[in-house]
Amino acid sequence: GVNAIELMPNSEFEGNSSWGYNPSFHMALDKYYGTPDKFKEFVDSCHSRGIAVITDQVYNHAYGQNPIAQMWWDGTNNRPAADNPYMNQNCPHPPNCWGNDFDHYVQPTRDYMDRINTYWIEEFKIDGIRFDFTKGFTNNSNADNYSAPRIAALKRLADTLWGVDQDFYVILEHWGPNNEEKELSDYGMMLWGNVAHAYYEAAMGFTSNSDFKWGIYKERGWNDKHLISYTESHDEERASYKIKTYGNSSGSYDTRTLATMADRKILTHAFLYTIPGPKMMYMFEELAYDISIDNPCRICEKPILWSYYENNHRQKVYFYTAALIEMRKKYGVFNTDNFTYALNGGAKRINLSTTDTNATVVGNFRVTAGDVYPNFQHTGTWYDYFTGDSIVVTNATAPMTYQPGEWHVYTDVKLNKASFIGEEEMELAATNVAVYPNPSSGNVELLVDVAEGTDVRYQVYDITGKSVHEGNFNAALYRVEYMDLNHLSSGAYLLKIQAGSAVYNERLLIE
């Protein structure tokens, strides 16, 4: 379901390990991202899969290795010199100051940005740029106020980009006043919308400060779906870490257990991806990544835990997230302009409508059972997208009692049941399954020990979630199935086996 990859700054930064927000050479590819030819291969590979590539450029500032700073430098005061044609001597908008501040109102800085952006587009064929901290594109000491010169500078920047590629994605991390962000959105730019903290509270089961409606473009009074909302980013703590460390509980229902934490993560995704407009997922969020941002330090490298694919609770998050994204891509009702919502408190809902389909998303974010109010658009038969079951609604405004963490997506038109999701899935014990050899050169034996006559289905997914091989058989007591996977490239895959209502997942390595 992913249709764009947004990288952190990949131009040359100071040091060997960094997020990249300490830029030194904006036009040079940092070695951490490979050689230029390898990076081009990456872009081409993404494009062949229908995935756009978006890079991150930091033009608010540059650090000391940058030649523009060094050529006009005041060594006595350790800052850009008064005659520096690109940079301010002092950052004019504290406290948000890093490195050496660019003056975005002078022509040399504009030319510098334009030449670099054009190079990245024409040389590497990137599809968009996320511009870091564009609220800093001002010389005003109060950057939180509306700034007409800043607006003009950003519109000029966007126009230049669209002159090179009319379909180019211009994304701003702006954090400016809403009237300014609305004007930029109206002009065609997209903007980051951080609602992580409200989603944290909802996921942890603390509902008094859990209203995440600010992640909806309509709530801000915007005309277009240009708000990129998200529950996690590089700047925020991992939601799963927050849940497992600080989550709420009541009786036997404890959000801090792995199983319930995973369910709470799915719950929040159900109320992120069903909101119309672009959404962003941070890496491994689909597997409930729960290593703290501060472990061992904020900008330190974090472990890549491929073993998460072998955990059934994390796999559940992965598959439900994939199904939610597939649903929003496949059915237009989840991209409608006609929707309402009630997201305060423990009972939350989203109601979406088109001329031919209505959808209602409803969930209980409390840690206790309680009433929710779906506010169905009409009475009659409604269908649960994830179970395939139906309900008959006789009173559209009547409450329903949900268990803690329970949620549903209802539609008044029967849609194809979500892929990846079976009935209430039970774990198929590892003692009932053998996969040999693993790692494999391509020929794999699958041995399944289940009741005779059981229907067994198996699928192999690549790391993007795409099904690359599948099959099914009717099991004898101990059935050996041979899988020819020689057509697959070397790498890690997920093998999912479903026998009746039982499921088994195993990481499969092709050498």
Listing of model-derived features with the role each one plays in the protein:
Residues V2-I126, R130-P149, A153-D165, Y169:
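Substrate-binding/active-site clefts of carbohydrate-active enzymes
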Residues P9-S11, Y21-N22, H47-I51, F133-T231, ...:
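Active-site-proximal helices and loops of the catalytic beta/alpha 8
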Residues R49, K225-H226, A396-T397, T431, ...:
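Short loop/turn microsegments at loop-to-beta-strand junctions
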Residues D127-F131, K279-E285:
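Active-site regions of oxyanion-processing enzymes, predominantly non-cytosolic
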Residues Y241-L258, R298-I304:
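A solvent-exposed, charged loop/short amphipathic helix patch at secondary-structure junctions
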Residues A398, H408, R479-M483:
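Short strand-edge motifs at loop-to-beta-strand transitions and within beta-strands
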Residues M426-E511:
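C-terminal outer-membrane/trafficking sorting elements
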